[in-house]
Amino acid sequence: MEVKTLGELCNIVSGGTPSRSKVEFWKEGTIPWIKIGNIKEKYVNEADEYITQAGLDGSSAKMFAKGTVLYTIFATLGEVGILGIDACTNQAIAGLTIKDTNQLNTDYLYYYLKSKKNYVNKISRGVAQNNINMSMLRSFELPLPEISKQEEIVAILDKVFAIINDRQHELQKLDELIKSRFIEMFGDLKKNDKGWKILRFSDFAKIDTKMIHDFEEYQDYPHIGIDSIEKGTGKICGYRTVKEDAVASGKYIFTPEHIIYSKIRPNLNKVALPDFIGVCSADAYPILPIKGKCNRTYLAYVMRDKVFLDYILAFSNRTNLPKVNKKQVEGFSCPIPELNLQKRFEDFVKQ
């Protein structure tokens, strides 16, 4: 099978941001200006900000035609979408315009880029700003079967992802039900309208950082990086073993008794409940609830709640790279209901 680079197959350029200080670049703008947060589905049809023609002409922003494939290259890496409208983007997004559509199918390119997400996050590690440059993107190699075969692959993947999307919508409804039950049982934790006893974090949990550097006996253990934890839901997915990831730097041990909390970019709200033993990135904290004081499931949902998120973001927003430390987490206080009520909530979640 023929293999070509993205640079051979596509014209690839990044977007730009018109100066915010120039009102005429933004006021009454009509040109959609796409940001990472707008890439939520396969097709990108909406923007929440618009620029003027003067803003487009007076900046590095570029107009991309409907059908252009968008790929995020800065901060949140590897998000992919296909423009359903003519639009421009900020500099965190690259636009890929296929040179010859008889050689490369747009949807095939979309699915190929989706498959590269773990790879781009891996090669970007160690880069201070968490990004990939245009040269790296242009060098990605793409297997290139005949166009008819590409269309067959796309048809199969469309069906697969339709099933996945349906399942995700079901899980989203379930997650909303759980959050609703949480509020029903425990009230608004910020107001503590049910009058629960307030305890400091260190009174009901501890940050249990047992770091290992020698991985000889841990080769078959799951290795959970922060990219393996889904934002908001805490679902653990896409991980490999210590051996497969060729882990060399220090990691933390965790068990099914721990919560894994990502301390990097806490706005992503990555709070996981593992049901196996493994090692996790040093960019996360294994948190161990104290028996007799706090239930693991209850604490995980507290940490996903606005009461914890607002508290922790007040610290992380003061730095260029949002990150929280041990002292800040341990300084958190929250209502701790009776254990039997926490257990009832856990039983509801497990149903």
Name each region found by the language model.
Residues 165-166:
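Contiguous mid-protein beta-loop-alpha structural module that forms a pocket-lining wall or clamp
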Residues 2, 73, 87-94, 113, ...:
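A short glycine-rich beta-alpha junction/loop motif
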Residues 19-26, 126, 197, 214-222, ...:
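Short coil/turn segments at secondary-structure boundaries
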Residues 35-36, 46, 50-114, 250-252, ...:
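A short beta-sheet element
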Residues 7-22, 37-66, 202-213, 226-256:
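Sequence-specific dsDNA recognition surfaces
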Residues 120, 308-311:
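Periplasmic-binding protein-like
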Residues 1-17, 41, 139-155, 170-212, ...:
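Non-catalytic DNA-recognition/assembly elements of restriction-modification systems
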